[in-house]
Amino acid sequence: MALTATAERTNIDLHSDMIKKAENLIPVLKERSESANVDRRIPKETIQDMKDAGFFKILQPKQYGGFELDPHTFSEVQLRISQGCMSTAWVLGVIGIHPFQLALYDDKAQKEVWGEDDNTLVSSSYAPMGQVTPVDGGFKFSGHWQWSSGSEHCDWALLGGLIFPPEG
């Protein structure tokens, strides 16, 4: 019972810490919001600020360096970030949800992404713009995915594609 109470207290403290960090970033994000909108990309400094604050690790499993907090904490942080820059909040939402999704995958996939660097960010383009071909040991993706918010800051991507039935 004491162990559970301690874990819950730690999560409450982390939640509060994340909210404070997000609130502290609001003035900086307001200063950068015009350039983010004009350049149509979030400044590298902003991504680094969010990495340093741990925002991309809110939903990431603890075993891979994350905080493994609840989606409520993530959405509260995103809401605070939106007060400084809506575009930044959008990109945080897009990139920051992927640790939750990746945590649902087999551990082999998680090790592949976070095994060497638990700060690795993942983008996505779920629209099935590519073709998926089954090959020995997996699948081959080919195509052109036209957009993925925040992808220039990521090393991995979750992609959508179509598998066509074999001819014949």
PLM regions with names:
Residues M1-K20, N24:
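Basic/polar N-terminal segments that are highly enriched at the extreme N-terminus
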Residues K44-D52, F56-D155, F164-E167:
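Glycine-rich flavin
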Residues M18-K21, L25, I42, T46, ...:
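General structural feature for long, well-ordered alpha-helical segments within catalytic domains
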Residues H15-D17, E76, L162:
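Short N-terminal signal/transit or membrane-insertion segments
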Residues L25-S33:
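N-terminal capping segment at the start of a domain
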Residues D13-H15, E34, D117-T120:
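Intrinsically disordered, low-complexity segments enriched in polar/charged residues with Gly/Pro
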Residues L158-L159:
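Extended active-site and interfacial segments that coordinate phosphate-rich ligands
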